[in-house]
């Protein structure tokens, strides 16, 4: 009998510090009305100076493991999706492994920006279904606030910090029915942090020029996102032999309310079936989908047997969707 992978548990963690749009009115040329009408964002959470991505990730991880009714020692693999790691070396996943005491786990990071969690779920599915690992912890965690340029009002107001996690393991029925992913490196300059890597190493000049902060070509990303969010959802549904009328709930990447609305319209999906929390947290990159998934589950929006679509897009450019028959 073939092993089928599914979601065994979910969890999330948000930093305590919350900043509304009026905070940004005081430090840059913007307004609550401008931010709200263009993005749907009202507030976002920022980590403390002393908090790193691994701190947020560890707390979300422990909640997901508890939800799955497992012990930390049961985790055999940790996949952590992030674009804001604690440091270049070692991987943030290894730091989390040590922090939570997952002594039996292999650990590595992946970098696919806002698509990272879906990429992680896809990788975990293969490992579980081929029998390589039984219980895989997938985490999406970010501290984007530490990589913002407050001279760039179009980008600085968008991002927030947080972490979400899911335990992927064998299920008797349902589970992860299909996934679809894609990448287009021609769009590499649409979303980037230019300095700090081997292309442009850190220096006094790069720091002074704000080249260690997130840069985004907003209009290009918007057009790409609306097209790809719907397209990749349809591809994943097709692989699962389902269509849009079979969707019980959509959990999209929370980047912009207009992108979410436009994508849902293309899928002919009522917004009542779409989870939205961008107003509370802004764009949390790889943490966006797992945080939304955890909240949707705990609020009773997702029920056992539901067909749930997780879909995201991000820098790279990258995109991905997973169709999950909910088993919790």
Swiss-Prot record:
Keyword Transmembrane helix: no
Keyword terms of this UniProt record: Acyltransferase, Cytoplasm, Fatty acid biosynthesis, Fatty acid metabolism, Lipid biosynthesis, Lipid metabolism, Multifunctional enzyme, Transferase
Region (ACP-binding): 254-258
Catalytically driven reaction(s): malonyl-[ACP] + acetyl-CoA + H(+) = 3-oxobutanoyl-[ACP] + CO2 + CoA
A Pfam family matched in the record: ACP_syn_III_C
Functional pathway: Lipid metabolism; fatty acid biosynthesis
UniProt GO molecular function: 3-oxoacyl-[acyl-carrier-protein] synthase activity; beta-ketoacyl-acyl-carrier-protein synthase III activity
InterPro entries in alphabetical order: ACP_syn_III_C, ACP_syn_III_N, FabH, Thiolase-like
CDD domains given in the database record: KAS_III
CC terms in the record's Gene Ontology section: cytoplasm
Active site residues of this protein: 114, 253, 283
GO terms (BP aspect): fatty acid biosynthetic process
Entry keyword Nucleotidyltransferase: no
Enzyme Commission designation: 2.3.1.180
Entry's localization field: Cytoplasm
Domain notes: The last Arg residue of the ACP-binding site is essential for the weak association between ACP/AcpP and FabH.
Entries under PANTHER family matching the protein: 3-OXOACYL-[ACYL-CARRIER-PROTEIN] SYNTHASE, BETA-KETOACYL-[ACYL-CARRIER-PROTEIN] SYNTHASE III, CHLOROPLASTIC
Function: Catalyzes the condensation reaction of fatty acid synthesis by the addition to an acyl acceptor of two carbons from malonyl-ACP. Catalyzes the first condensation reaction which initiates fatty acid synthesis and may therefore play a role in governing the total rate of fatty acid production. Possesses both acetoacetyl-ACP synthase and acetyl transacylase activities. Its substrate specificity determines the biosynthesis of branched-chain and/or straight-chain of fatty acids.
Subunit structure, interactors included: Homodimer.
Family, as annotated: Belongs to the thiolase-like superfamily. FabH family.
Protein name: Beta-ketoacyl-[acyl-carrier-protein] synthase III
